[in-house]
């Protein structure tokens, strides 16, 4: 499929933008043969030398900018590279080519495991994540009750995360991320968190953060939410940019691709 690549101009690469993504690519190696034990792995090397790998190109030559105060959407089919892209923005992965420039403090809400430890309690994780985000202990303490109340987890504050349901853990992660006062919030499928009431509360909070002039990068399959919140949008498929621009135009193109 022919793709319409968005090309950065030189004046895009300045601090007027919250994020600049310049020609990044990311690939993963997938082994053709799985070795279950170290012994089998070593035996295989002795018998046959090296193993063969399939190279999976998760992202290819991705470029775009996000302005300060903008709510920017990323859409595309499952497996298109959306979550990989957010992890690169968050610093979880590094691109194999290109570069990312971030102007501001990022708070990622991607998945449990980014900044949270399953063997620690909810309380310990709140303080750990806050410290990672650069908050002092007194700053975290001042936000502590609000974090637990928003997550609706006050009575579970001394429970270890490994005993939480996935929904409880994600509620805690989202509630903590939004209270660290980030300049840039990365959100992956927030509307999958919790029940319908909590999803609406998350959506309202994102809208509140947006109106406060913060930068938000939002990945979602909920196109209505993308259209409500995002001024611009990026559509990616099979690791490539299809188009980037005004949200309604990009969503319309995505719907056309989905019906082919």
Regions found by a protein language model. Name each.
Residues 226-228:
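A short, surface-exposed alpha-helical micro-motif characterized by mixed small hydrophobic
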Residues 220-221:
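H-loop/switch region of ABC-family ATPase nucleotide-binding domains
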Residues 238-239, 254:
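Conserved ABC ATPase "signature" C-loop
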Residues 75-77:
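The feature captures the beta-strand-to-loop junction immediately N-terminal to the Walker
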Residues 1-58, 247-260:
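Pre-NBD coupling/linker segments of ABC/ABC-like ATPases
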Residues 39-47, 127, 139-156:
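Conserved ABC ATPase "signature" region
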């Amino acid at each position: 499929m022919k793709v319409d690549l968005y090309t950065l101009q030189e004046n895009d690469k300045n601090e007027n933008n919250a994020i600049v993504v310049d020609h990044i690519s990311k690939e993963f190696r997938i082994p053709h043969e799985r070795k279950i034990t170290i012994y089998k792995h070593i035996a295989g090397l002795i018998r046959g030398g090296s193993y063969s790998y399939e190279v999976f190109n998760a992202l290819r030559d991705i470029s775009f900018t996000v302005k300060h105060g903008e709510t920017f959407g990323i859409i595309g089919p499952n497996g298109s590279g959306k979550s990989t892209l957010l992890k690169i923005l968050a610093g979880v992965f590094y691109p194999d080519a290109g570069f990312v420039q971030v102007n501001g403090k990022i708070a990622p809400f991607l998945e449990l495991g980014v900044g949270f430890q399953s063997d620690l309690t909810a309380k310990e994780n709140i303080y750990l994540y806050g410290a990672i985000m650069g908050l002092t202990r007194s700053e975290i303490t001042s936000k502590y009750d609000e974090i637990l109340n928003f997550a609706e987890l006050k009575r579970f504050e001394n429970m270890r995360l490994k005993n939480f349901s996935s929904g409880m853990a994600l509620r805690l992660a989202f509630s903590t991320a939004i209270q660290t006062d980030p300049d840039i919030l990365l959100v992956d499928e927030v509307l999958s968190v919790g029940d319908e009431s909590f999803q609406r509360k998350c959506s309202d909070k994102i809208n509140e953060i947006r109106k406060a002039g913060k930068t938000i990068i939002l990945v979602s399959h909920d196109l209505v939410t993308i259209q409500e919140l995002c001024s611009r949008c990026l559509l990616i498929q099979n690791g490539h940019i299809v188009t980037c621009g005004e949200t309604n135009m990009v969503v319309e193109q995505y719907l056309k691709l989905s019906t082919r």
